[in-house]
Amino acid sequence: MGNYLNQDGKKFYEITHSDIYVDKTELLTYTNSVLQTLQKYICISRPRRFGKSITASMIAAYYSRGCDAKELFSPYKIARNLDFDTYRNKYNTLFLNMQEFLSRTKNIYELLDRMKRLVLRDLKREYPNVDYFDDTDLIESMQDVYQETNCPFVVIIDEWDCIFREYKQDKEAQEIYLDFLRDMLKDKSCIALAYMTGILPIKKYGTHSALNMFDEFSMINPGPLASYVGFTELEVAAQIGRASCRERVS
């Protein structure tokens, strides 16, 4: 268990034990269906406060080898799925909130360097006996771990597009960041699933060709994920009807 690699599921525990939680765990039936396929690249584009980070934490808790989430998920819909145990907590799961790295660094070089060093520390702590070709290279080290363990990675990148909002006019910084994402994720057999969240669709940043392996799901085109992201009218009505919620409204 690390800070970024194979987290312990406590974030999702806190979410599910809060006053309001709407069960969106059936999204995992979709992510399970695309694991290690060409459809394994998913980008969710929604405005703020639409539960993107909550869903990302749910995915991390379900796949992470850093915890046993059977009891945590047992009250929810995904637990009734026949494949619930097949994929649960079986993957090296990397959770990156890019806003966290952005707020602690001054430029894109510092951001990527800090992120790589922190993830590499987690990786080497979890797999100290792997024969790393270059233990300062994150992408190669992930491939080395996969080759020796046959355990692929689920990579979750929350707020992937915050770099574009911070460096609006810095095309070089944007290209460096995109090059990193492409090199890390594209055509890599060690990646079982890549799940990114952002505010605007990839094409809005003029970068669609660099990340053209991703399927995008937005408010306008939610596709098969329509009922899993955001809230339906019935879900909103059910929450308003709860006593704790009525007290807040009044």
Question: What are the residue ranges of the model-derived segments?
Answer:
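Phosphate-binding site recognition
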Residues: 1-248
